[in-house]
Swiss-Prot record:
Annotated protein name in UniProt: Holliday junction branch migration complex subunit RuvA
Annotated region (Flexible linker), positions in chain: 144-147
Gene (name only): ruvA
Renumbered residue ranges of the record's region Domain III: 147-190
Compartment annotation: Cytoplasm
């Protein structure tokens, strides 16, 4: 089994890259977020998960820049009915932190991706709700002030993931704001 690969990106496609490691080109499937960080000629180190697809008689490599994203994939594929491709679609839409929040808050809308029905979304939430605490996500900086601001923006009709991203960006830039100021800045930004 391959733990990680370090090499130069030879080609970037819609859902994978070809990673040149010592003149051997590996096809590595990536989430859209990880894929956007790769450019031809760039040097990258990817954590790797290997999946042997017996139906198609192929072995596929899935790459991750962060350990958290890799752990999310491993949890998602343990849910009955979630394939590696489906898990990567979810991780293309949500960061590990957003996935964590969506499962804890039972946010079915945030988990909605193409090809994922309501039954499977419910199964993901049900099966992973108790397991998300095992995710080693740096969630410490997202404290109660942010949760209050997030709740306020959601109640005003904004989408959870967009509100979360906006609040996180505001807190990263200005960490000592109170809830009222975070909401005010978020409303100007969204």
């Amino acid at each position: 089994m391959i733990g990680n690969l370090r090499g130069i990106v030879d080609e970037v496609c819609s859902d994978h890259i070809i990673l040149n490691v010592n003149d051997v080109g590996y096809i590595v499937y990536l989430s859209a977020k990880t894929l956007s960080a790769c450019s031809i000629g760039s040097r990258v180190k990817l954590l790797i998960d290997t999946y042997a697809n017996s139906r198609e008689n192929v072995t596929q490599l899935y790459g991750f820049i962060s350990k958290e994203e890799q752990q999310c994939l491993r949890l998602l594929v343990k849910v009955s009915g979630v394939s590696y491709k489906t898990a990567m679609s979810i991780l293309s839409k949500l960061t590990p932190e957003q996935l964590f929040l969506a499962i804890i808050n039972e946010d079915k809308l945030a988990l909605k991706v193409s090809g994922l029905g309501l039954k499977l979304i419910n199964r993901i939430i049900t099966e992973l709700n108790g397991k998300v605490s095992k995710l080693e996500i740096n969630n410490n900086h997202f404290h109660s002030i942010s949760e209050d601001a997030l709740s306020a923006l959601i109640n005003l009709g904004y989408e959870r993931t967009k509100a979360y991203d906006t609040i996180k960006k505001i807190e990263d830039e200005s960490p000592n704001l109170d809830t009222k100021d975070i909401i005010r800045m978020a409303l100007k930004t969204i």
